[in-house]
Amino acid sequence: MVIATKHFGEIELEEDKILTFDHGIFGFEDCKRYTILYDGEDENSSVISWLQSLDEVSLALPIIQPSHVIDQYNPVIEDELLVSLGDIKEENIVVFLTLTVPSDLTKMTTNLKAPFIINTANKKGCQVVVEDPMFVVKYPVYEKFQNRAKKEDGEC
């Protein structure tokens, strides 16, 4: 199927790439169908990806896997919050965090408090709130990206 996207224009999307969020996401409860788009050639070459709504073209959120910005992100999430994901196993769960990218990139943050949890086996997703106060809504990530780039360039 062909879909319109906010940042990539019209693209061809295979049906098996559609994710369903039964309850939508916070602030966009009516938008239930999404896909993940990658800036790079594939998902392995992209640090930042996009959670693109299929129900509202203008809704595309930059997302990142926690391992790119924080060590040991393993919040406790109540089982009842994950019921909509169906049968979950560690090997079929992927976690993403939203990024906030202001014009001053040094102030870029990610939201550790409200991750997206996706069951890759059945393509179901949900967004949850982590109760632990250690996980904040605005976690600075610019310096983390800088350090990562230095490591990849072999400077560290």
From Swiss-Prot:
Signal peptide: none annotated. It is found in: Cytoplasm. It comes from the Bacteria. GO terms for biological process: bacterial-type flagellum assembly; regulation of translation. Keywords: Bacterial flagellum biogenesis, Chaperone, Cytoplasm, Translation regulation. Belongs to the FliW family. PANTHER family: FLAGELLAR ASSEMBLY FACTOR FLIW. This is Flagellar assembly factor FliW. It comes from Lachnoclostridium phytofermentans (strain ATCC 700394 / DSM 18823 / ISDg) (Clostridium phytofermentans).
